[in-house]
A protein has these predicted regions:
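Intrinsic disorder/low-complexity segments
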Residues: 2-9
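N-terminal, polar/charged subdomain of small-to-medium soluble alpha/beta proteins
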Residues: 10-101, 108-110, 114-120, 124-159
């Protein structure tokens, strides 16, 4: 059975984008590069998260409460600024089929060491602390992925 998913931009604030469905990584990364190509940044480090086929899932599905995610992201924008860098991200809302992308991020920096360090820190913190709720899609049913989710400190979720 083949499921067709459509993707369209739902929400954008400076340097953070939310889309319905899987991400068009080539379009996003190309647009980001075009935006900053002439800004004298010596490093552009992208990261792509791809949905793996495991445990019988056909897709993952995501819920996001935008104000909480925006607050989390704004802290990273400030951390990046302090190091002379820019951090960007895009994430999916809703269903994202296996072998497609639900998350991309990138760092632009004058120095590669800063960019490499910052992208690693950002992606690791995203995985551990970004307020995004993940569900497995198995046989067309959405099942909360509690075993692969991280409790949010002070939120009373998953705790």
């Amino acid at each position: 059975m083949e499921i067709e998913f459509q993707s369209y931009l739902l929400y954008v604030v400076v340097d953070m984008e939310l889309y319905n469905g899987s991400l068009d990584t080539k379009e996003i990364f190309g647009r980001w590069l075009d935006e900053y190509q002439n800004s004298n940044y010596g490093a552009y480090i992208p990261f792509v998260g791809i949905i793996r086929a495991e445990d019988g899932i056909t897709a993952l599905s995501f819920d996001i409460y935008k104000p909480i995610l925006q607050s989390w992201f704004d802290k990273w924008v400030e951390k990046a600024k302090e190091r002379g860098a820019i951090v960007k991200m895009a994430h999916s809302i809703g269903d994202v089929p296996i072998h497609t992308s639900s998350y991309v991020s990138a760092v632009f920096s004058p120095q590669r060491k800063v960019a490499l360090s910052l992208i690693n820190e950002f992606v690791e913190d995203f995985k551990a602390n970004a307020p995004i709720w993940k569900y497995d899609v198995i046989d067309g049913k959405r099942i909360y992925a509690q075993d692969r989710s991280t409790p949010m400190s002070g939120a009373g979720l998953l705790g």
